[in-house]
Amino acid sequence: MLVLFLLGTVFLLCPYWGELHDPIKATEIMCYECKKYHLGLCYGVMTSCSLKHKQSCAVENFYILTRKGQSMYHYSKLSCMTSCEDINFLGFTKRVELICCDHSNYCNLPEGV
């Protein structure tokens, strides 16, 4: 009887039996990482990264500029980036759009691309 009481007490006091939980890790934001992402597919290996101090999830959308000056979507790069800011870079042959987010897990998946 005493053994059952002790076992019950151990199971009540140790709800995460065999696992160590860090309360900070439970609130980490996760992001996708892919060097070349296009139309819902990662050409390579899709991995995850967790945000560290001053980091955000980032999507870099690469566009090719046509002779008429229009942008044609080419591919995206997904990553965790330090000191990330939303910005557009415009060159003679390409445009790069950088979009940053840190509001939810895996928020850096491009929509409508």
From Swiss-Prot:
GO cellular component terms attached to this protein's record: extracellular space
Would the keyword Secreted turn up in this protein's UniProt record? yes
**Where does this one sit in the cell?**
Secreted
**What coarse category fits the chief subcellular location reported for this protein?**
secreted
* Tissue expr: Isoform 1 and isoform 2 are expressed in prostate and testis. Isoform 2 is expressed in male and female brain at equivalent levels, in particular in cerebellum, cerebral cortex, corpus callosum, occipital, parrietal and temporal lobes, and pons, but not in amygdala, cerebral peduncle, hippocampus and thalamus.
Q: List the disulfide bonds.
A: 31-57, 34-42, 49-80, 84-101
Annotated UPAR/Ly6 domain residues: 29-110
Instruction: Kindly indicate where the leader peptide sits in this chain.
Output: 1-26
Q: Which UniProt keywords apply?
A: Disulfide bond, Secreted, Signal
Keyword match DNA-binding: no
| CDD domains to which the protein is assigned, alphabetical | TFP_LU_ECD_PATE2
Coiled-coil segments: none
Family note = Belongs to the PATE family.
Instruction: Give the PANTHER family listed for this entry.
Output: PROSTATE AND TESTIS EXPRESSED PROTEIN 2
From the Swiss-Prot or TrEMBL record, give the protein name: Prostate and testis expressed protein 2
